[in-house]
A protein has these predicted regions:
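Core transmembrane helix bundle of multi-pass membrane transport proteins
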Residues: 2-29, 90-312, 377-432
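Helix-loop-helix junctions within the multi-pass membrane cores of secondary transporters/permeases
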Residues: 12, 76, 103-121, 125-129, ...
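Membrane-embedded helical hairpins/re-entrant loop segments and their flanking transmembrane helices
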Residues: 12-25, 33, 37-71, 276-358
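Short hydrophobic alpha-helical membrane-embedded segments
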Residues: 27-34, 51-58, 78-79, 204-208, ...
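Alpha-helical transmembrane segments of multipass membrane proteins
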Residues: 38-41, 61-69, 88, 114-115, ...
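Membrane-helix interface "capping/anchor" motifs
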Residues: 66-77, 220-226, 352-357, 400-408
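Membrane-interface helix-loop-helix modules in multi-pass membrane proteins
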Residues: 69, 73-110, 530
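The feature marks cytosolic C-terminal regulatory regions of anion transporters and related permeases
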Residues: 396-554
Length: 554
């Protein structure tokens, strides 16, 4: 039974009754996407058994669906967290030991996520400059591609050990964090020709064909093939080739999971919190990474999916963050990689016709069913096929289109973007984002922003008449003082004619302009009007409507 296309779908059990077939179908299609991706993400994250990536997606679907503040997002493990989780596992020694200790970081970070939501910190994503965030995501994409290339080539795991571990600290028996800057990306790149020379011919063929399929499908814009998830075709072709080449005789070539019931009955709780006392500095560092980057990526997805929602429903970001934190606490205790609201599966969910949160629930149920009855099929999937899917995910984060977009915004944003990428890859994500933030502050000051305006919004609301409001901003409108301006705007009475007057601002940066246009869309969707005014002498630093603008008088 389906609803009228103009009627907003109901939530809860009523929503399931109204949209059962649509959500069931979408949930099944997303399941076909999620299964191979969840396996690949878990493996790439350093989790010994990839089944735990699927367990994360199951919890995200079956449990978090009903805790979530968003209706159409799909919760599950994310490629964007691969460098962080794999880095965390390696920092604690790698293998089983590193996994158990990394789970301690995941659980503590998850509790922090819950607190973020309860303290209504869902808006903190607005504080970060857009160029720095996009730089971080592009850097993550590049890291994913680099780390998956050896697997695509079928390189045996023992040739990768030196590229993934640092010098062991005799005091702890763990890799010295000082030797592991940038998750060893620089060292991995230097050693790549030597590493790839150990390729396996049959696995390389499977990997390359898988890569051609997943990239080729991205160019299909319509027709029957567009409706088929590319990962499904990749897995079918890869399994067929794997059987033909008899790669089951090649060590480490195929996914190995074991039976779900056997794994969970043997050891249901896998977390180890001893890292808190043995190496507290390393523990705290990775907790911060997981909590901040995971929360940020999830919040950005929620915002993006709200824009794609056919009914323009608004999510509760704080509730969603709390739900994700609760889900991650459970997955961390059991052994899974952390989940976020994942953008690729969520946008596909909308494309497949999902109407309510039940699509996420059904996708989780199908995943659970697969682990109960389809393990023999899962265990003939070649790892190079999963590597191809992850390389494509990395490419989406760091595509040439992203670089062109940042250049279109202006040289200031492009510089911040590039510097953030370099520092994230050479050092770590937190240092990279912090560098991007500081660089944007410096560029804003160089453009004429006053230091006293960096963190203080100077905005007043004037009521012209009963139906007309003016928000007059003086000083500078910057990412670093935007939350104060946003607070005044969201508190305005709905349904009025609002003018955001930026004519007296010396500097209006890109992040603020972009956020104001989003607020404008939200306000007008609720029946009001909003106009954003800037001075005729404001000069844009780029070619976009939201490029940074600087007031040039005389």
């Amino acid at each position: 039974m389906s609803t009228n296309s103009n009627q907003i779908p109901k939530d809860g059990l009523e929503g399931m009754k109204q949209n059962f077939l649509a959500d069931l179908q979408s949930g099944f299609m997303v399941f076909l996407l999620a299964l191979p991706l969840s396996l690949g993400i878990a493996k790439a994250s350093g989790i010994p058994n990839p089944i735990f990536g699927v367990i994360t997606a199951i919890i995200g679907g079956i449990i978090v669906s009903f805790l979530s503040g968003s209706r159409l997002t799909i919760k599950g493990p994310a490629a964007g967290l691969i460098p962080i989780i794999s880095g965390c596992v390696v920092a604690f020694g790698g293998g089983e030991q590193g996994w158990h200790l990394a789970l301690g970081c995941i659980v503590v970070a998850s509790v922090i996520q819950v607190l973020f939501g309860l303290l209504k910190m869902g808006n903190f994503a607005d504080f970060f400059p857009g160029a720095a965030i996009h730089g971080m995501l592009a850097s993550i994409g590049i890291m994913i591609i680099i780390k998956q290339l050896p697997i695509l080539f079928g390189v045996a795991g023992n040739f990768l050990k030196d590229a993934h571990t640092g010098v062991v600290d005799p005091a702890t028996g763990l890799p010295d964090p000082k030797t592991m800057k940038g998750y060893d990306i620089v060292g991995l790149v230097k050693n790549m020709p030597s590493i790839l020379s150990h390729y396996d011919q049959h696995l390389l063929i499977i990997g390359v064909i898988s890569l051609v399929i997943v990239f080729g499908f991205s160019f299909i814009k319509s027709g029957f093939l567009k409706k088929i998830p590319a990962p499904l075709i990749v897995i079918i072709v890869a399994i067929t080739l794997g059987i033909s080449f008899m790669v089951k005789d090649t060590p480490g070539a195929l996914v190995k999971t074991g039976r779900l019931t056997d794994i969970l009955s043997t050891q249901f709780i896998n977390v180890d919190f001893s890292g808190i006392s043995s190496i507290p500095g390393v523990f705290i560092k990775w907790v911060i990474f997981i909590a901040l980057v995971g929360s940020l990526e999830s919040l950005l997805t929620v915002k993006a999916i709200d824009g794609l929602d056919p009914w323009k429903r608004k999510s509760n970001a704080n509730k969603d963050l709390t739900g994700v934190g609760i889900g991650n606490t459970l997955t961390g205790l059991i052994g899974g990689s952390p989940m976020i609201a994942e953008v690729v599966r969520s946008s596909a969910n909308i494309g497949f016709g999902a109407k309510t949160r039940w699509a996420n629930f059904f996708h989780g149920m199908f995943l659970l069913l697969a682990l109960l009855v389809a393990v023999p099929i899962i265990e003939v999937i070649p790892y190079p096929a999963l590597a191809a899917l992850l390389i494509f995910a990395g490419y989406r984060l760091a595509s040439p289109k992203e670089f062109r977009h940042m250049l279109h915004l202006g040289m200031d944003q492009f510089i911040i973007f590039i510097v953030t990428i370099i520092v994230c890859a050479a050092d770590d994500l937190l240092v990279g984002v912090a560098t991007g933030i500081v660089l944007e502050l410096i560029l804003n000051i160089v453009s004429g922003a006053k230091i006293g305006n960096l963190f203080k919004s100077r905005a007043v609301v004037e009521e012209k008449n009963s139906n007309q409001l003016v928000v007059r901003v003086t000083g500078d409108a910057l990412f670093s003082n935007y939350l104060g301006l946003k607070k005044k705007i969201v508190e305005l009475q709905k349904g009025k004619n609002v003018t955001i007057d930026l004519a007296q601002c010396k500097v209006i940066d890109h992040t603020t302009l972009n956020s104001l246009h989003e607020l404008q869309h939200d306000y007008e969707s609720e029946g009001g009007t909003m106009i954003i005014l800037n001075h005729e002498h404001h000069v844009a630093k780029g070619k976009s409507e939201t490029s940074t603008k600087v007031l040039k008088l005389g």
